[in-house]
Amino acid sequence: MTLALLGAGAIGLAVGVPWGATLIGRDRVLTPIAAGGLRLTDARTDRTFGPDAIRTAGPEALASADLIAVATKSTALPSVIQTITAHARPHTPILSLLNGLSPVRDLAAALPNPILRGMIPFNAVWHGPAHLHLSSTGSVAVEDHEATATLPQVERRADMEALQHGKLLLNLINPINALSGLFLHAMLSDGSWRRLYAATLTEALQVYDMAGLAFTKAGPIPPRL
């Protein structure tokens, strides 16, 4: 299977390089990676991928891809749609790795391609021009489909929409953390900020219940605890 990854930034590289994807992104990011390889670290592992494991290309590579993974920012989605329309075959499945619920709907509304859901459980931070550190461990979750059957190190699931609803609940902590101006551990050690997060989560769960939206936990703790 030929896999192309559109949006080879920090998250895209953290996922696409271990997958053996053809990477499509900005030259300033990809040039040092192509020349010297990529180091990926997390709390438990330290992996190095040499230059021979890095494949880069322009958007024309989408034409021969059997699966296209999208890992851009959500704000770049209009440009992504234009690029896919211009270069990809209309039947090639698109795997959306973007945060939020709307990217999958927007891609499906704009493209004839099958649109698959994916979810990345970690963040990736640059520790140098060719070194990415992952904030946590965990497998990328992808929709169970014949196009994702050979992707390595993933969790194939039939409940991706419910999982994305759960990830949205998990992400509610991010704006509160930004407002606090504290490191996450320090914020969670403060009862006032914990109560604010709990109130936000309670309101979100009420909205889900009223809308009849199913969700499954996207982290180690169920949101209703």
Q: Which sequence ranges carry the predicted segments?
A:
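Rossmann-fold dinucleotide-binding core
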Residues: 99-182
